Amino acid sequence: MNIKSLFEDYIKLPRSIFILFFAQIVYSVGSFIFPFLAIFFTKTLMFNEQKAGFYVMLATAAKVPGLLLGGKLADVFDRKKIFIIFSTLSALFIFACLLVVQSEIIPWLLTISAVFSGANYPAMKAMVADLTNPDNRKAAFSLLYLGMNIGFAIGPMIAGLLYNDYLDLLFIGDTVTTLISVLLVYFFIAESFPRLNSIRHSIVSDYGDEKAEQGSIYRVFLSRPFLVFFTLIFTLYSFVYVQSEFTLPIQMIKIFGERGPQYFGSIMTINGIVVIFLTVIIISMTRKIKPILNVSLAAILYAFGFGVIYFSTRFFLFALSTVLWTLGEIIATTYSDVYIINHTPITHRGRFSAIIHILIGSGFIFGPYLSGLFINNFGVEKIWPFVFVLAILSSFLMYLLYYFENRTHSTLKYS
């Protein structure tokens, strides 16, 4: 594989995707506030842990109504306008935190900001779907995923350096970077919302999974059983992956003691380095494989990546496991987006993005709590064999879904 072939699919992407790539980097670099919410509430606002936990949960949960609102509006009005309006409102409510005197108001301003932040997500996903086709979506989604991770690799580091002495700059920086990303979209990306004539033509003429549909989100979603089952199975993936954020640091603190947080930070650095430097290579190597088979492969990498932690007592093994599950993360994130969009009607892209994001996100929401119950009863080490089995099961179920979907399409083709 030569260098030219690595970037072949990316070079062919439309200009608008590269604009979104740079906008994604800028937006992610400036995500200073929400990753530090727990520290901000406890150290700066002096809330106790219970009160801080409530407000963190509130800000997280606030994205759900935002997703539903943004998904609905993105399918009715121009996607670009919806993204610009909600992103701007999200930024302004973060900036408003600098203007209030009473600290009790700040968590509510951040919660409102989270609602609008959630609302811009379906519009962004719908725009990417509109601007791409099944042939170039693998490259497009992997590029945007790379942009997000480049930003997140830089942003928290800057925030950590500025937090103690220049906290106000974090609120200003978060606001400014969001507005810059909005300006990039406003000036350089054309509206992508499907016109009425193309929707009518799609209803009559198209036969694929992206065919325009009439009816409620629930009827249309349930009429795509393969996408429904994909979403349910992929929820297991999110439960497996959340162990990297919850159980892994607990395990490392137990093994390495006071050095645990430092080593966990190194693990997160390895994760970021692998994503930044290997995403293009991995996607180029797997681009000819069907998206759903790639997602099945990702679960196997999860299985061995997290499973090896059961035997890990040295940092080297933790580093090796991180490389494995990060490769799974790259493949799962990119190709799940591709599969979902390829099975989403053009009339429901915003709403599908919202509802599927919420369903899959339940693994991240309930995963830490269920893992905590397991750890309390059986110990932290015992969870890794369970995670290994769950990942293998997820891979098998995903492959079964591919088998039945492929057989169904073959039957329809020759009937």
PLM segments and residue spans:
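Residue-level signature of mid-helix packing/kink "hotspots" within the transmembrane helices
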Residues: 32, 60-68, 152-153, 272-280, ...
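Juxtamembrane intracellular "pre-TM" segments in multi-pass secondary transporters
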Residues: 1-14, 192-230
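A membrane-interface helix-boundary motif in multi-pass transporters
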Residues: 164-176, 373-391
